[in-house]
Amino acid sequence: MRNWVRQIHMVGIGGSGMRGIAEVLLNLGYAVSGSDLRPGNSTLRLTDLGARIFSGHEAANVRGADVVVISSAIPESNPEVQAARELRIPVIRRAEMLAELMRFKQGIAIAGTHGKTTTTSLVASILGAGGLDPTFVIGGRLKSAGTHAALGSGEYLVAEADESDASFLYLSPVMAVVTNIDADHMETYGGSLDNLRGAFLQFLQRLPFYGLAVLCTDEAVVAGLIPELRTPVLRYGFGADADLQARDVTVQGIGSRFAVWRRVDSDYVHWLDVELGIPGRHNVLNALAAIGIASKVGIPESTIATALADFRGVGRRFELVGTFDGITVVDDYGHHPREIAATIAAARSVWPERPLVVAFQPHRYSRTQALFADFVSSLAAADRVILTDIYSAGEKALPGVTGRALAEAMAAQGMSVRFLPDLLTAPQQIRAELPAGAVLLTLGAGSIASLAAQWPQVFGEDPS
């Protein structure tokens, strides 16, 4: 690519999937520019690395670019996309650029509706601890590295494989994980679960004959793909058909302990004891997937165990913001009913005796409409729920699909719920809703993330 491409322009460069790729490209020596509707903290690091960042989308921004990379949120009607088409500048999706980067490495792609970011981070951390110095591109900030991405000197590139727009089908990894397959982004697949399943099957069938598919066989849809694969498969989970099986899971502080048993012929042997610095059974599964990859590339068990014990998580994935006046605040990206349920369950396991309050910002009108009843049932596990209005993520509003409607449906089932439409004024109002000693979970993939920095001012103290 270097002989033909020097200037790369990225539309939506502040997005979680874009800025990691931008950072790797900058470190490779490419000239990178980009635009975002709300550049800010998400693009400061890129500016420091030499990227030119434009606020807003204008046709003039693409001048001089050899290629334009767009995120999945950018429509064809975007003025920069239209200008690039008129100037005959190639326009590609972010996954196509990721696939180009992966061509020069041994690709490890992490797919699944839920758990991609954490699993990718775990894999990158273990490979780094094992001295393999991987390149990684993650949809969240790996706390230990302080970044979403890094250019390593080793042979492996670890990245998330995004199914939201089916662009993961551009990737050609040598190893892949599928954590789960769940109903989300169904507009991409014509509303058909069969089409969604088929896309994951195509993704796995792109693996070479010498590769490895690491699959969570606790998930029936994932397990059902195995008969159609020619690539070697490593099964993981809690179930009896797993090759790597987690047993004896216990809570340890804000984390967990568990034993890993490995199938040898027709029996299991106790292989590894793990201390994991992040909570929840879902994260035990994510760790099992990472262990499977690490064992394939030859990392010793002792190194795997140490890396998992040292792992401190990813930004906005059960991120402990702090404790203020006896109130513990945890921030999480969860925005799908299943993610919400898993995060609430994790919080309950860590703080079983404390009141649990969830402040949730629904994300996308289409998702809220499609999974309306599931949102109600998943949020019912909290003691109290505070709802904001829906974060559109660029979608047009749908009649009758509002945060207020969701709150009313919850109240009709006897749930304790409060609707706060304006997120800008929400922090003080949320503070007033919290009982003494509560745990507050702020959940959502939209602008609710901005609340984390406001709590010291709201509570009038620094976190303890």
From Swiss-Prot:
InterPro entries associated with the record: Mur-like_cat_sf, Mur_ligase_C, Mur_ligase_C_dom_sf, Mur_ligase_cen, Mur_ligase_N, MurCDEF_pg_biosynth, UDP-N-AcMur_Ala_ligase_MurC
Pathway, per record: Cell wall biogenesis; peptidoglycan biosynthesis
Parts of the chain that traverse the membrane: none
Enzyme class: ligase
GO annotation, cellular component aspect: cytoplasm
Keywords, comma-separated and alphabetical: ATP-binding, Cell cycle, Cell division, Cell shape, Cell wall biogenesis/degradation, Cytoplasm, Ligase, Nucleotide-binding, Peptidoglycan synthesis
Name under which the protein is recorded: UDP-N-acetylmuramate--L-alanine ligase
Organism: Acidithiobacillus ferrooxidans (strain ATCC 23270 / DSM 14882 / CIP 104768 / NCIMB 8455)
Gene assigned in the entry: murC
